[in-house]
């Protein structure tokens, strides 16, 4: 997606705004801030749907005793092939989630508290959270259990609750009317409804809409297509000559990660092989995007979101990266 397409998808499709950024009073969707936060989290991390949609509050540093800033958390059970890696969440994405947690999530949690209390025997009731070690301890089916958060599969995350302001509430960041984590069908429904709104409100100011509706995975592609050329230009300088750029790209396949944008982004995405990430370079060669401005104001209102991501990626890459 381009910048304009992403903002249209997030703000008009998911967020209930009109194309001119005014409130859409005919909007009949639920929890627009949830959709916006989900989109910002997906784009800001480059993670797969199963990774960002199942994230828990402690993983983003949200909750009593947690530090609030940019966050890092480890995925394993919800990652593709169970491959362990570290996901970095920039401050703007955290801010977007904070807005949702402040304005919408409490009402959903309050409405579902009694229902969850009746079902507590079927839920994993978390009693202690170790933010430093990334572990939780609680009761499931009458048995005391302890888990590394990264090792918790999606079905366990969905039934994880803790004692909140209104009683039992989900430990998941994103919740629906039932009080627990939305499933794949729910997120698909949110996306389809967003597409219908985007098409219905399209006018001459609307950015180009593709023939097929966007998928959540397209935000992951956008992350790669923005971050990869940004790192390339930052580390190796701009190269307008197409043939030279292609030679440089081929050299990335065997280069050292410390000086290699391809391998840094490959690790960020959790690709099993740099060859998979290499495909993105074919798209960057046409220079469609204005890379100098590409990373400004994509997520929140700040100016450093993707520059922050790039700086963190370079820092991690220089030290060998996260967990491969």
Locate each region found by the language model.
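Flexible interdomain linker/hinge and immediately adjacent N-terminus
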Residues: 1-18, 78, 177
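Short, structured motif recognition centered on aromatic/hydrophobic residues
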Residues: 9, 41-42, 52, 96-103, ...
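Short, basic (Lys/Arg/His-rich) helix/loop patches that form interaction surfaces
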Residues: 192-267
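Short functional hotspots where side chains directly engage DNA or cofactors
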Residues: 65, 73-76, 215, 241-284, ...
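A short, glycine-centered helix-capping/turn motif at helix boundaries
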Residues: 41-54, 230-235, 258-259, 269-272
């Amino acid at each position: 997606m381009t910048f304009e397409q992403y903002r249209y998808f997030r703000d008009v499709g998911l967020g209930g705004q009109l194309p001119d950024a005014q409130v859409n009073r005919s909007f009949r969707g639920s929890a627009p801030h949830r959709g916006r936060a989900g989109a910002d989290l997906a784009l800001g991390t480059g993670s797969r749907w199963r990774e960002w949609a199942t994230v828990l509050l402690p993983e983003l540093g949200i909750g009593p005793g947690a530090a609030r800033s940019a966050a890092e958390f480890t995925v394993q059970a919800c990652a593709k092939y169970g491959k362990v890696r570290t996901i970095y969440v920039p401050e703007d994405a955290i801010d977007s989630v904070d807005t949702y947690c402040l304005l919408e999530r409490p009402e959903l949690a309050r409405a579902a508290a009694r229902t969850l209390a009746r079902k507590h025997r079927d839920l994993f009731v978390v009693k202690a959270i170790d933010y430093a070690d990334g572990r939780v301890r609680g009761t499931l089916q009458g048995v005391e259990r302890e888990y590394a958060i990264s090792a918790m599969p999606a079905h366990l995350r969905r039934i994880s609750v803790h004692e909140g302001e209104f009683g039992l509430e989900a430990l998941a960041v994103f919740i629906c009317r039932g009080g627990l984590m939305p499933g794949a069908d729910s997120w698909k429904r949110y996306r389809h409804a967003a597409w219908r709104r985007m098409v219905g409100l399209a006018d001459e100011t609307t950015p180009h809409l593709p023939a097929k509706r966007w998928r959540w995975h397209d935000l992951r592609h956008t992350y790669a297509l923005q971050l990869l050329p940004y790192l390339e230009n930052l580390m190796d300088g701009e190269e307008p000559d197409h043939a030279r750029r292609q030679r440089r790209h081929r050299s990335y396949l065997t280069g050292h990660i410390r000086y290699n944008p391809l391998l840094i982004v490959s690790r960020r995405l959790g690709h099993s092989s740099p060859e998979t990430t290499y495909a993105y370079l074919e798209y960057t060669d046409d220079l469609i995007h204005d890379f100098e401005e590409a990373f400004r104001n994509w997520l929140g209102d700040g100016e450093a979101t993707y520059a922050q991501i790039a700086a963190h990626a370079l820092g991690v890459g220089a030290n060998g990266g996260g967990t491969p």
